[in-house]
């Protein structure tokens, strides 16, 4: 079976990672002790992708928990599913990274990274045929961003032919912990562009807006934001965990979704949006779900898809529904909004259906879009970065850990290049080649 090794780094990474394991354990009928109590063969069919079967029929997550301070991991350990993880897979330091990317990437994190890689190796060796890695982390702090990207490049060195997938939480002033988030995020994106195959951009700005506007929560907590994240992560991994044809492994997903290697930043979406602990009073129809999931308000990245064009899209419908209706509705969306899909990639929208819906819903749909509008997110961070970097504000915290200003300049220009690449493909048309030909003839 094709296994995935999951790594969660830093406070945010460990919190959303822990929620992810709660949600998928529930979907696969696995209780907090790792015992199976399910009711469907589908739950066990591909259980080995994320779980190792230990002695006595216990299922243990292929998860590695990493942090530079013990706090968050202690709370994961004492949380609802804390006992399901392998005790040896908790790797933590004592110093903390103090929201400083340089500490996570070059100093504190670099000291801990080898002990993490030992655990990674151990997990990889127990796999029959490892397909790749997934990392949950944030880009705004010190450990998840700095040490997370360090882990990615080290794993990349050791397993160059395995897929590297990240769930990266992008910082926003609306839910901000630190003033240096734009620095940490820019330095991280600089790494992600080069070293990952697929990155789901989970944007705190969008999560906050969904909680505030759609779910009418006046003061959203991290718990509320993480509820949305776990629903989304459960949705985008459905194809990997349950039997099906489309995007059934990380590599197939990458082949379908990434037309150019640097443009691998996906915009996730989810419908129906519900708040924690609420029940759904009416089942939505397939047309309603389809219409909702393409709506900017349902995107987990604060970008308006109507400001760009989709290069590729994958949608995962969950629950009992007619395949025919799903296909009709998806075609309908494409026909009505054809200008928002690039015409030079035909059939760039793919759909999968899984019979098992998420807990508490009859039907749900998860959306993965590779849209050029994601440049809005990078522009937002870039503007905040430039405002501080122009005055060299807070730089001494980074140079004090041995970093050079040059590295900031490089990261900044790499992110600006990424924005221009998205813009270039947004403006590209199928007919362009011929135009160039004609112009050349006229000049001649």
From Swiss-Prot:
Induction conditions: Autoregulated by feedback control of mRNA degradation. In excess of soluble tubulin, nascent beta-tubulin chain binds TTC5/STRAP cofactor through the MREI motif which triggers cotranslation degradation of tubulin mRNA.
Keyword Cytoplasm: yes
Disordered: region residues: 423-444
Compositional bias segments (type: Acidic residues): 429-444
Modification 5-glutamyl glycine, positions: 438-439, 441-443
Residue numbers bearing the 5-glutamyl polyglutamate modification: 434, 438-439, 441
Post-translational modification: Some glutamate residues at the C-terminus are polyglutamylated, resulting in polyglutamate chains on the gamma-carboxyl group. Polyglutamylation plays a key role in microtubule severing by spastin (SPAST). SPAST preferentially recognizes and acts on microtubules decorated with short polyglutamate tails: severing activity by SPAST increases as the number of glutamates per tubulin rises from one to eight, but decreases beyond this glutamylation threshold. Glutamylation is also involved in cilia motility. Some glutamate residues at the C-terminus are monoglycylated but not polyglycylated due to the absence of functional TTLL10 in human. Monoglycylation is mainly limited to tubulin incorporated into cilia and flagella axonemes, which is required for their stability and maintenance. Flagella glycylation controls sperm motility. Both polyglutamylation and monoglycylation can coexist on the same protein on adjacent residues, and lowering glycylation levels increases polyglutamylation, and reciprocally.
Location of Omega-N-methylarginine modifications: 318
Gene Ontology CC: one annotated term: cytosol
Modified residues (N6-succinyllysine): 58
GO MF terms, alphabetically ordered: GTP binding; GTPase activating protein binding; GTPase activity; metal ion binding; MHC class I protein binding; protein domain specific binding; protein-containing complex binding; structural constituent of cytoskeleton
Keywords of the record: Acetylation, Cytoplasm, Cytoskeleton, Disease variant, GTP-binding, Isopeptide bond, Magnesium, Metal-binding, Methylation, Microtubule, Nucleotide-binding, Phosphoprotein, Ubl conjugation
InterPro entries, alphabetized: Beta-tubulin_BS, Beta_tubulin, Tub_FtsZ_C, Tubulin, Tubulin/FtsZ-like_C, Tubulin/FtsZ_2-layer-sand-dom, Tubulin/FtsZ_GTPase_sf, Tubulin_C
Subcellular location(s) per record: Cytoplasm, Cytoskeleton
PROSITE patterns with a match to the protein in the record: TUBULIN, TUBULIN_B_AUTOREG
Cofactor: Mg(2+)
Phosphoserine modifications at: 40, 172
Tissue-specific expression: Ubiquitously expressed with highest levels in spleen, thymus and immature brain.
Crosslinked positions (Glycyl lysine isopeptide (Lys-Gly) (interchain with G-Cter in ubiquitin)): 58, 324
Modification Phosphothreonine occurs at: 55, 285, 290
Motif, MREI motif: chain positions: 1-4
Signal peptide range: none
Family: Belongs to the tubulin family.
Subunit architecture: Heterodimer of alpha and beta chains. A typical microtubule is a hollow water-filled tube with an outer diameter of 25 nm and an inner diameter of 15 nM. Alpha-beta heterodimers associate head-to-tail to form protofilaments running lengthwise along the microtubule wall with the beta-tubulin subunit facing the microtubule plus end conferring a structural polarity. Microtubules usually have 13 protofilaments but different protofilament numbers can be found in some organisms and specialized cells. Interacts with CIMAP3. Interacts with DIAPH1. Interacts with MX1. May interact with RNABP10.
Disease as annotated in the protein's UniProt record: Cortical dysplasia, complex, with other brain malformations 6: A disorder of aberrant neuronal migration and disturbed axonal guidance. Affected individuals have microcephaly, ataxia, and severe delayed psychomotor development. Brain imaging shows variable malformations of cortical development, including white matter streaks, dysmorphic basal ganglia, corpus callosum abnormalities, brainstem and cerebellar hypoplasia, cortical dysplasia, polymicrogyria.
Protein name as annotated: Tubulin beta chain
Organism in which the protein naturally occurs: Homo sapiens (Human)
């Amino acid at each position: 079976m094709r296994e995935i090794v999951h790594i969660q780094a830093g406070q945010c990474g460990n919190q959303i990672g822990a929620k992810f394991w709660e949600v998928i354990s529930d979907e696969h009928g696995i209780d907090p002790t790792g015992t199976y109590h399910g009711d469907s063969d589908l739950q066990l069919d591909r259980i080995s992708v994320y779980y190792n079967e230990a002695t006595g029929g216990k299922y243990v997550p292929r998860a590695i928990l990493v942090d530079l301070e013990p706090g968050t991991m202690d709370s994961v350990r004492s949380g609802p599913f804390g006992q399901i993880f392998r005790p040896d897979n908790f790797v933590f330091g004592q110093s903390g990274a103090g929201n400083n990317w340089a500490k996570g990437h070059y100093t504190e994190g670099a000291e801990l990274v080898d002990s993490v890689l030992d655990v990674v190796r151990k997990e990889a060796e127990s796999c029959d045929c490892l397909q790749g890695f997934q990392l949950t982390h944030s880009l705004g702090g010190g450990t998840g961003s700095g040490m997370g990207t360090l882990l990615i490049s080290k794993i990349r060195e050791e397993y160059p032919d395995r897929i590297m997938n990240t769930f990266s939480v992008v910082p926003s002033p609306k839910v901000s912990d630190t003033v240096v988030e734009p620095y940490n995020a820019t330095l991280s994106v600089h790494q992600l562009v080069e070293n990952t195959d697929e990155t789901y951009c989970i944007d705190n700005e969008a999560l906050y807006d969904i909680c505030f506007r759609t779910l009418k929560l006046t003061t959203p907590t991290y718990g509320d934001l993480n509820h949305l994240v776990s629903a989304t992560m459960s949705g985008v991994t459905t194809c990997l965990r349950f039997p099906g044809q489309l995007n059934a492994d990380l590599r197939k997903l990458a082949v379908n979704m990434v037309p150019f290697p640097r443009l691998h930043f996906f915009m996730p979406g989810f419908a129906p949006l519900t708040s924690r602990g609420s029940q759904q009073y009416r089942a939505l129809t397939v047309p309603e779900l389809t219409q909702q999931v393409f709506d900017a308000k349902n995107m987990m990245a604060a970008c308006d898809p109507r400001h760009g064009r989709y290069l590729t899209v994958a949608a995962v419908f969950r629950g009992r529904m007619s395949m025919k209706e799903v296909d009709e509705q998806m075609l309908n969306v494409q026909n009505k909004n054809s200008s928002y899909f690039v015409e030079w990639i035909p059939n760039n929208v793919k759909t999968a259906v899984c019979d098992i819906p998420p807990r508490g819903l009859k039907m749900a749909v998860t959306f993965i879009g590779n849209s050029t509008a994601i440049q809005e997110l990078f522009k937002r961070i870039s503007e905040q970065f430039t405002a501080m970097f122009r005055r060299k504000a807070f730089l001494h915290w980074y140079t004090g850990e041995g970093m050079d200003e040059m590295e900031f300049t490089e990261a900044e220009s790499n992110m600006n290049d990424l924005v221009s690449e998205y813009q270039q493909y947004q403006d590209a048309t199928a007919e362009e080649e011929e135009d160039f030909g004609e112009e050349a003839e006229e000049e001649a």
